């Protein structure tokens, strides 16, 4: 019996200075403000490590810090200036985290909510800016929003807050990276448990009924 080589998944989230677009590039134009990572042990399905950091403003010229974006995440320029780290230090921290929690075959696996479309491009540009390639460390990218679409054909919407609420997961201090990431890690764990059939007695009963119905119809 083969054993899964997936040992860790790093659930990650960014707070940013706005939304990227055709003429507003992630990280290079739209500022990174905050990052948080929560590491999930995939055997125990438990959180085993955390990392969070604010980015010191002005890591390059002409960065966008839209007032409406800062109003949503609650960050201020003063807070980031006083508590923030240089972007290069954060890049090194993330590289170390990806290296520490790499999987034997898959490298680092990162996950977030709408991570593929929004967050991961910031990681790519952050690493590129310092002459590195995020794909050297990250091989798989997972997305709890995608898992929500796959799991539920219909729900009010597929925002993180709604997905957490539907899965009885509290989301306190939403729109700050560490709070979003902790809740999203629990959401990710709940989806994995569902995939593994943990706590899903209905599917087990259906499977047994299916086997009982067809077991005498299989030719010997």
Protein language model features and the residues they cover:
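Substrate-recognition/cap helix-loop segment adjacent to the acidic, metal-dependent catalytic center
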Residues: 118-140
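Residue-level recognition of the N-termini of beta-strands and the immediately preceding loop/turn
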Residues: 106-109, 137-142
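Conserved non-catalytic scaffold segment of RNase H-like nuclease domains
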Residues: 2-124, 165, 175
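A structural motif
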Residues: 152-164
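Active-site flanking residues adjacent to catalytic metal/cofactor-binding acidic residues
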Residues: 12, 142, 179
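Acidic two-metal-ion nuclease catalytic site recognized across multiple nuclease folds
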Residues: 2-4, 166, 182-220
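Short alpha-helix plus adjacent loop in nuclease-associated cores
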Residues: 141-155
């Amino acid at each position: 019996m083969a054993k899964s080589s997936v040992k860790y998944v790093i659930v990650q989230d960014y707070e940013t200075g706005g939304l990227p677009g055709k003429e507003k590039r992630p990280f290079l134009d739209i500022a990174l403000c905050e990052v948080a990572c929560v590491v999930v042990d995939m055997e125990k399905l438990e959180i085993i490590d955390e990392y969070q950091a604010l980015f010191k403003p002005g890591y390059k010229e002409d960065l966008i810090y839209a007032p409406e974006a800062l109003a949503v995440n609650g960050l201020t320029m003063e807070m980031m200036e006083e508590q923030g780290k240089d972007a290069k230090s954060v890049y090194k921290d993330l590289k170390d985290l990806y290296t520490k929690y790499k999987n034997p075959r898959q490298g680092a696996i990162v996950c977030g909510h709408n991570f593929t479309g929004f967050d991961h491009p910031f990681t790519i540009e952050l690493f590129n800016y310092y002459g590195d390639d995020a794909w050297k460390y990250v091989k798989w990218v997972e997305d709890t929003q995608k898992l929500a679409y796959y799991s539920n054909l219909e729900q009010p919407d597929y925002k993180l807050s709604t997905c957490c609420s539907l899965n009885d997961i509290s989301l306190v201090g939403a729109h700050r990276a560490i709070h979003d990431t902790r809740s999203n890690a629990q959401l990710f764990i709940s989806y994995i448990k569902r995939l593994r059939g943990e706590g899903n007695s209905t599917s087990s009963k259906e499977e047994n009924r299916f086997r009982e119905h067809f077991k005498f119809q299989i030719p010997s």
